[in-house]
Amino acid sequence: MSDSVYRVTEVIGVSPESWEAAARNAVETAARTVRDLRVAEATRFDVTVQDGKIANYRVRLDISFKYEPGN
């Protein structure tokens, strides 16, 4: 097995539908600009409230991807 280094960054996904949809939005959006995305770990879940009702579900994710020198 070759040596590898991974970078971890935090993203927040938002959806009016569900936490799952919020996580999917975050991963799919990050994957458009981050190559070799490997793992997404949900670290926090919360909601925004408007007029006494849930307006949006939010998921904070730590995403990891293979580090390439020069990036």
Kindly give the residue locations of the regions a language model identified:
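Residues in well-ordered beta-strands of folded domains
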Residues: 12, 43, 64
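Short amphipathic alpha-helical leader/targeting segments
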Residues: 36-40, 66
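C-terminal structural segments of small proteins and small subunits
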Residues: 52-71
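Short, well-ordered alpha-helical segments
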Residues: 4-37
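Short, conserved loop-to-beta-strand elements that form functional interface hotspots
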Residues: 40-49
